[in-house]
Amino acid sequence: LLAPGAPGPRANRRLLVGSHIDTVVDAGRYDGNLGVVAGILAVEELARRGIRLPFGLEILAFGDEEGVRYPKTLISSSTIAGCLDPTVLDMVDADGMPIRGALAEFGGDPDHLAAEAYLRGDVIGYLEVHIEQGPVLESKGEALGVVSAIASQGRYRLTARGEAGHAGTVPMALRHDALAAAAEIVLTVEEIARRGVKDSLVATVGEIAVRPGAGNVIPGEAVFSLDVRAASDAARSAAADEIRRRVRDIGKRRGVVIGIETMLEKPVAAAAPWLKRAIAAGIEAATGAKPRELMSGAGHDGMAMINLTDIGMIFVRCRAGISHSPLEQATVDDMGLAVEALVETIVRISDGPGRS
């Protein structure tokens, strides 16, 4: 926290900087954490320079951005932004513990989460530094980039229910194999996504559980994830609709009942033009070169924070574009440039007229 040091009309408002401190299973050390540490270092540098900002600066460290323990993403940032659906608190983890119970065990009060939200009029904007999680910056030989928008995203959970049976006694023509239906759906999802290159459409099935899960038993149930993303809401929605139609056809043909549950649907979150300009100027001051703009295919806390305020993001080059992996890596030099760019961005926001 850096309190405002100069009087003026924005003295009672604050600029928010942050990211998340959770990550996926078997991941790296930079996804999310970099943005929190960069914000802390930026505060130190501003204080070292003796810069008096006309607004407060607050660093946020979000939890539950990834949706690993619970089937819901952006829980902390949605709380701060005042857009958390209270029914989410009843979701349970693999051990049956609801979110509200976990919060209570941690010392929180799930019945008063609404009081944690910022008021829109109190916030100037939200900035986040994050590794790119893709290969573009590295391929162009550039350390930093300006995020133009965060892609439209949908997450779904599918349950295929067939009929379990003996692997050796049920003829192939009489089977209702839930896993075989799921496998066909996976290939169908891939086919649909490959046709959406112009819309930056991607779709992934990354998790599947089969029951009863024995080598000599025909699978009676398969529960699996589906992640669909695109550069536009229309493209993502159209792909999801086509997947639903094809899933119905597969289920009918195979005699398998397939349900689709929507876990999350988030529209494109566009960065505010005035923040993009401030970030571009900050990056140019730090690197000496004009930065490029990039669409973020990965989801970020900005998708929730845009419900509260304008958002802007700085992307940092990562090796080979690898993320959500222990091989995830960013160099000290690039991270240092990101901190410099963040400082320069904050200075330009303090000097400028703000939202335009």
Identify the meaning behind each predicted range.
Residues G18-S19, G220, K290-A341, I349:
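Zn-dependent metallopeptidase/amidohydrolase metal-coordination segment
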Residues R52-G56, L113-A117, T169, E191-V205, ...:
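Flexible, glycine/charged-enriched surface loops at secondary-structure junctions
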Residues S148-I150, H166, V170-R195, A235, ...:
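His/Asp/Glu-rich mid-to-C-terminal helical/loop segments that flank catalytic regions of hydrolases
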Residues V17-H20, D26-E66, G154-A160, T169-I192, ...:
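Alpha-helical metal-binding/catalytic segments enriched in His/Glu/Asp
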Residues I21-T23, L57-V68, Q133, A164, ...:
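Acidic, glycine-rich active-site loops and adjacent beta-strand->loop/helix elements
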